[in-house]
Design a protein with these regions (language model features):
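Short amphipathic alpha-helical segments and helix-helix/interface helices
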Residues: 17-21, 59-60, 85-89, 136-140, ...
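Catalytic core and acceptor-binding pocket of nucleotide-sugar-dependent glycosyltransferases
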Residues: 118-206
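Short, flexible loop segments at the rims of nucleotide/cofactor-binding pockets, characterized by
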Residues: 46-50, 77, 130
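N-terminal anchoring/stem segment of glycosyltransferases
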Residues: 1-69, 116-118, 173-174, 188-206
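Short, solvent-exposed loop/turn segments at secondary-structure junctions
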Residues: 9-11, 36-38, 78-79, 103-106, ...
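GT-A fold catalytic core of metal-dependent nucleotide-sugar glycosyltransferases
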Residues: 51-107, 111-121
Length: 206
């Protein structure tokens, strides 16, 4: 199965030191590097919308290249804690797409498993045609076009606990997580600190 990801120079350290370093040997990695159109790489800074638009373009290409098969998309601010392929397939079941739960009934466009079919391809194309600010808003506005569900909270974000932006506070982390997505914080340095905190807690508990 293919796992797709995309990043610019500001997120290279996340790609090499966290995503690739912890990714289980179950996938063919299809990585796309894009220009640094957002100078900081930070959430909603100038150029962020263009960067997110590149993700939507990638969703379309990935779907077209895998018709009749399943694929995964993952942001690079993600680390893994074991094998996930079979669990993702099981959780997807007969749905078209299963996304990380970003809390508040919001589907996260930063980590999902997708059955590449006409419904999901149409959804991704509608996201591009009706693009609204960034990829996640666009996904949630068009996801009704296919059969969707949330992944279990083993596919973890700190937002499951805090429901607010993380600024360095100590948090107890569930012991059974399989994936940690370092969203719900702003800036590459904060993402690194959050990834390290979660890794340390899981390694200690293990």
């Amino acid at each position: 199965m293919k796992i797709y990801t995309i990043h610019s120079n500001s997120h290279e350290i996340l790609y090499t030191d966290y995503f690739l370093k912890t990714l289980p040997d179950e996938f063919d990695v299809i990585s796309t590097q894009i220009p640094q159109e957002c100078s900081t790489g930070d959430f909603y800074k100038p150029g962020w919308d263009i960067t997110c638009y590149r993700k939507v373009e990638l969703f379309i290409r990935a779907c077209e290249d895998n018709m009749g098969e399943k694929f995964i998309f993952s942001d690079v601010d993600i680390q893994f804690f074991g094998n996930i392929k079979d669990i993702l397939i099981e959780e997807l079941g007969d749905y078209d797409i299963a996304c990380q739960n970003d809390t508040g009934n919001m589907y996260c466009s930063g980590f999902f498993i997708c059955d590449a079919n006409e419904r999901t391809l149409n959804m991704f194309k509608k996201m591009k045609e009706n693009y609204n600010s960034e990829d996640q808003t666009s996904l949630n506005q068009q996801i009704h076009l296919c059969k969707s569900k949330f992944l279990s909270k083993r596919f973890f974000t700190i937002g499951h606990i805090t429901h607010s932006v993380w600024n360095g506070q100590d948090i107890d982390i569930p012991k059974d997580i399989l994936v940690h997505h370092a969203n719900w914080t702003i800036g590459t340095n904060n993402k690194i600190n959050l990834l390290n905190m979660v890794r340390k807690k899981i390694d200690y508990n293990g």
